[in-house]
Design a protein with these regions (language model features):
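Signature aromatic-anchored transmembrane alpha helix within multi-pass, membrane-resident enzymes
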Residues: 192-196, 316-335
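Alpha-helical transmembrane segments and terminal signal-anchor/GPI-anchor hydrophobic tails
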Residues: 54-58, 66-72, 181-294, 342-343, ...
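TM-lumen/periplasm interface segments of multi-pass membrane proteins
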Residues: 1, 17-93, 337-348
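Membrane-interface transmembrane helices that cradle and orient dolichyl/undecaprenyl
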Residues: 140-154
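Transmembrane-helix signature of polytopic, membrane-embedded enzymes
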Residues: 104-120
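Membrane-interface alpha helices of multi-pass inner-membrane proteins
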Residues: 123, 154-178
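Short acidic/glycine- and proline-prone juxtamembrane loop motifs at membrane-interface regions
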Residues: 128-134
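Transmembrane-helix motifs of polytopic, lipid-linked glycan transferases
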Residues: 91-107
Length: 348
C-alpha cells in the first residue's frame, strides 16, 4: 500500500508535467501540494516499511548509542513532547523536506520535473530511509547557491551545520573550491575524463583513500571493512557496469556534449556537472565497499534533481525530453522498490 501511494503520486506528477503551460503560479501551487503530501507520507509512515526506521527506533531507546548530537537532541524533544519515536520522524521530515523543496525551487526552472526526480529516487533513499542524511543533503542543496556565488565562508558554515546531522557531510568540504563560472577547456577535459579515470582505478583496484591522511576517513573505512569481513554487510564488490549507473553516465555525457548549446539557459549547469562528476568518482573509488560507494555517491548525486531536467533544453520537441525524464524516473523507482527492496508493501 505504501509503495502504491508513492507510485500513484509519481504517476500524477508525471502526467501534470505534460500540461505545463508556463504558468508559474499554478506550477508553484502544484509543487507545494506535492511537497506537502511527501511530508505526510514520510512523517507518518509505518515503522519497518523501510530499511532504517527500526534501527532509528532502537537508537531512540538507547541514549548511549554513538550518533550525531542532533539525533540525541531531536530524540529528547520527541520524548518530551510526544513520548514516542514518531516525533523523531516528524521532526526530521520537517527539517529536510521544506528546506530541500525550497532549495530545489530556487535552483531549478522546472520544479515539477525536479520534484518528480526527487520523489522517484532520492525521496526513497533519504527522506524515507536515511533521515539524518536527508537533512544533511537538504542543507547541501541550500548551500550550492553560496558556492555558485563564491560565498565560500557561508558555504562552509552551512556544511558544518550539515555535519552535526550526518558526519558524512565532511564529503562536501572539498567542494568549496568549485565555482559556477563557465566551463574552461581544462574543466571540460576533466569532466570528460573523470568517470574514465574512476573506472581505470576501480578496475586496477587502486585504493587512493589509503593516502588520505584524515582520521575520520581512515576510521570509517576500517569500520566498514571489519563489518564487511564479518559478513554484517554486503561483501561483494559493486558491479561498476550496472545498467542504472551506465544510464546516468549516458545522461551526464549527453548534457556535457550539449553544454555549449544550453549553458545560457541552464544557470547552474557548470557547478552541477562538476559535483556530478565527483559523485561518479566516489562511486567508482569506493566500489570495493558497497555501503560507502552508494551512500557517499548519492549524497553528491542529489544534484541529479536539478541537472537531469536540463534535458528539456537539449532535446526537441520538449515533450520528448519530458518523456525521457519520466521513463528514467520510473525505471529507477521500480529498481529501488522491487529489485533493491528499499521499501516494503506492508509491515508484518
Amino acid at each position: 500500500m505504501y509503495i502504491t501511494i508513492i507510485g500513484i503520486l509519481l504517476a500524477v506528477v508525471a502526467v501534470l508535467i505534460f500540461f505545463d503551460k508556463e504558468d508559474k503560479h499554478v506550477e508553484l501551487l502544484i509543487y507545494t501540494a506535492v511537497v506537502l503530501l511527501m511530508f505526510f507520507i514520510v512523517a507518518f509512515r509505518p515503522i519497518g516499511i523501510d530499511k532504517d526506521s527500526i534501527m532509528y527506533t532502537e537508537m531512540y531507546s538507547d541514549p548511549d548509542f554513538m550518533v550525531e548530537p542532533t539525533f540525541k537532541w531531536i530524540s529528547s524533544i520527541s520524548s518530551l513532547v510526544l513520548g514516542d519515536v514518531r516525533g523523531v520522524f516528524i521532526m526530521y521530515a520537517l527539517l529536510a523536506i521544506p528546506l530541500k523543496a525550497w532549495s530545489i525551487h530556487k535552483l531549478s526552472e522546472y520544479s515539477l520535473l525536479a520534484v518528480l526526480i526527487w520523489m522517484g529516487h532520492f525521496f526513497i533513499i533519504h527522506e524515507c530511509t536515511q533521515i539524518r542524511a536527508a537533512v544533511a543533503v537538504a542543507i547541501f542543496l541550500y548551500a550550492i547557491r553560496y558556492l555558485s556565488e563564491g560565498k565560500k565562508k557561508k558555504y562552509l558554515l552551512a556544511i558544518m551545520v550539515a555535519m552535526i546531522f550526518h558526519y558524512s557531510s565532511l564529503l562536501y568540504l572539498p567542494l568549496v573550491f568549485l565555482g559556477n563560472s563557465s566551463l574552461s577547456t581544462r574543466w571540460k577535459y576533466f569532466l570528460y575524463l573523470a568517470p574514465l579515470i574512476g573506472y581505470l582505478l576501480a578496475i586496477l583496484r587502486i585504493d587512493l583513500l589509503e593516502l588520505v591522511p584524515i582520521p575520520f576517513f581512515q576510521d570509517k573505512i576500517k569500520v566498514y571493512q571489519e563489518m564487511k569481513d564479518k559478513g554484517v554487510m554486503a561483501g561483494d564488490d559493486i558491479n561498476i557496469f550496472n545498467v542504472a549507473f551506465l544510464l546516468k553516465l549516458l545522461i551526464y555525457y549527453f548534457l556535457l556534449i550539449k553544454y555549449e548549446v544550453i549553458k545560457d539557459k541552464a544557470r547552474y549547469m557548470p557547478i552541477m556537472l562538476k559535483i556530478y562528476a565527483f559523485s561518479t568518482l566516489v562511486f567508482l573509488l569506493f566500489s570495493f565497499m558497497p555501503v560507502l560507494a552508494y551512500r557517499g555517491s548519492e549524497m553528491l548525486a542529489v544534484v541529479e534533481i536539478v541537472l537531469i531536467p536540463y534535458l528539456v533544453y537539449a532535446v526537441r520537441p520538449i515533450n520528448v525530453a519530458r518523456l525521457l525524464v519520466v521513463l528514467f524516473v520510473f525505471a529507477v523507482f521500480l529498481q529501488d522498490v522491487f529489485y533493491n527492496n528499499l521499501l516494503l508493501q506492508s509491515v508484518s
